[in-house]
Amino acid sequence: MQGNFSKKIDPMSNLPFTVAALYCFAPLPQYESLREPLAQLCCANGIKGTLLLAAEGINGTVAGSAGAIEKLIAHITAIPGLGEPELKYSHASEMPFHRMKVRLKREIVTMGVEGIDPLKSVGTYIAPKDWNALIADENTVVVDKRNDYEYAIGTFEGAIDPQTRTFREFPEWVKQNRDRLEGKKIAMFCTGGIRCEKATAFVKGLGFDDVYHLKGGILKYLEEVPREQSMWNGECFVFDERVAVGHGLAESDVELCRACRRPLTPQDKLSQFFEEGVSCAGCYAERTPEDRARYAERQKQVKLAEKRGANKHIGS
């Protein structure tokens, strides 16, 4: 499956599915009432993916035909008080999602810290073309705002890995590492930008002034910055069946461990602990023999379903 990102839906794309990654922070006191109309619109138009609604706004990634996605974006943009979301389009040869979910949440991206409002205070946005100069500055601390399994398959040169498993762990990491950040320019990045909205707001709230984040995230950087000028190494994990993308947003050969959902490079699959659908080096010790036996049976059913031509995502 191929994929590429752009600011607008490309009418010349020969790929049948348009993928829209979007978010918008805005006061939405009526967010619960928005769920059903969104779900109905998506169902009626063959759109799949996930949309999260909360009192602080909307976040999600969805896929469908170009016309269907245009209808959805028009509907979202017309929601009173919301306005135009931060939006990135891509195209794919296969549907990258299995189903459609519209969920009500406390936060559209969960950090678990009360009072963080990106509408009031965030870091300075840095365009992809200016990012290299910032992170090459010896007075800049570069912080990968993603989780450890995302960092493991790709990151920027010199970036710190906070070794977090979830976004909720980031505030504690900052508090424990203040000495590494004091007196420095702090440059943060994440996949598409939304986690950095809250992360930079949080860090600024602790009294740090020189706080920056990559506008449009890694995806926009990989789209706009030529490979020969790039300071990115590896692949960028994405939260759908494409798994990861590289420079130019070309799909990579990274796959998912279907037992734990960690990304696996071809080298990872050479591990003695890797068994397709059952375990990988990252999760083998976390599972009991009973767990692995259950996963093995599930994998067997997946393979049987594939032979019958049934949905290939059974058990995934």
From Swiss-Prot:
It comes from the Bacteria. It is an enzyme of class 1 (oxidoreductase). SMART domains: RHOD. Disulfide bonds: none annotated. The keyword Oxidoreductase applies. One of its GO terms (molecular function) is oxidoreductase activity, acting on paired donors, with incorporation or reduction of molecular oxygen. Its EC number is 1.14.-.-. It catalyses: uridine(34) in tRNA + AH2 + O2 = 5-hydroxyuridine(34) in tRNA + A + H2O. Gene3D superfamilies: 3.30.70.100, Rhodanese-like domain (3.40.250.10). The keyword DNA-binding does not apply. InterPro entries: Rhodanese-like_dom, Rhodanese-like_dom_sf, TrhO, TRHO_N. Belongs to the TrhO family. Catalyzes oxygen-dependent 5-hydroxyuridine (ho5U) modification at position 34 in tRNAs. This is tRNA uridine(34) hydroxylase. It comes from Brucella abortus (strain 2308).
